[in-house]
Amino acid sequence: KGGIVRDPVSNPPARILLDNPRKNAGRLSVNETDADVAVATAEVRVRFDRSTGLMTVTDLRNGKEVIKEVKGVDFQKNRTTVTLRNAVGEFFYGGGVQNGRFSHRGKRIEIVNTNSWTDGGVASPAPFYWSTGGYAAMPYTFAPGAYDFGSTDKNTVTISHEMPYLDLFLMVDTTPVDLLRDYYQLTGNPVLLPKFAFYEGHLNAYNRDYWKETTEEGKGILFEDGKRYVESQKDNGGIKESLNGEKQNYQFSARAVIDRYKKDDMPLGWILPNDGYGAGYGQTTTLDGNIANLKSLGDYARKNGVEIGLWTQSNLHPVDSIPALLQRDIVKEVRDAGVRVLKTDVAWVGAGYSFGLNGIADVANIMPYYGSDARPFIITLDGWAGTQRYGGVWSGDQ
């Protein structure tokens, strides 16, 4: 049965593992000789050499030695490093969303929350990798790390995290699918997004900018009234946009966007009308007034087969010290306005590690509870192992 698995340090608290990640491994056998000590199930044997303390792991289903430790664990005050064999023809994948990188043989990857969305950045790290040699590894930690798959020594793999102890899950299976299933057994299956999420989404800000008519050649955007307009985040003397077009500004509204998709027979699944800094979703003097404005858009959108969502620049729950424009109340947004999509921002999850996991776990529970059992649709980044059970990960703003 095993004992209690010690959770890694996390602040704020978050859970990498599911509540019940164990499965019955069958009968365990322990074999001791003068040379080594081995623990085995019917499928896997873990052996420790008495003279060196080094570990080898064998897949008994095919007799293959899949993991071989080539150097003792290096314990430093603020870092622990494991060194394994890097076999000829062995390839490595994982580490989360490593922008522009997916096959890591001969390379070093950072398991670090970099808040970088371009080539080589780490949009959402995960302390996990799998090998074509028949194994996978997941350090059980929220600490930053680095995995070197032969960039300095082509014959070794090093797993290093900023922690003074070693806590590591090893998984043994022959196919990538089975290794991923092992990982999901520990951390949870990827969330199944709602049906509307598989249709096109439209993300923009429709509660902030001003549109001023221009006759200058080659400038502006052509609208339905036959005129061209220049957009500005500052008041340029033009018409200010809104969600519902209630201020004689329909063609600059979020409702107009929904109508354009319908007019052009383009299936639209969801819309985020506040995807821009300082946008908000209403122009009244109170949070409740703005939520009523959001609900009005939601009712119109749902009548046209579209769900609404929000980009989350601000805190999810009310903070009295900030203006009504940027106030948030996630419960009322979901329960009253009918919000069914949330896209995170660095202001919410940007600290990463346990912070990123903690924040979306909260919303993943709020959405079905206050949203009539709605399936959560969270678009996120800056995650960790376990993020996949709550939301879909994107690569960030390029």
Locate predicted features.
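Short, charge-rich amphipathic segments
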Residues: 147-156, 207, 214-238, 291-307, ...
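Short, charged low-complexity intrinsically disordered segments located at boundaries
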Residues: 120-121, 158-159, 209-220, 289-291, ...
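Aromatic-lined carbohydrate-binding surfaces of glycoside hydrolases
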Residues: 198-245, 258-260, 264, 271-288, ...
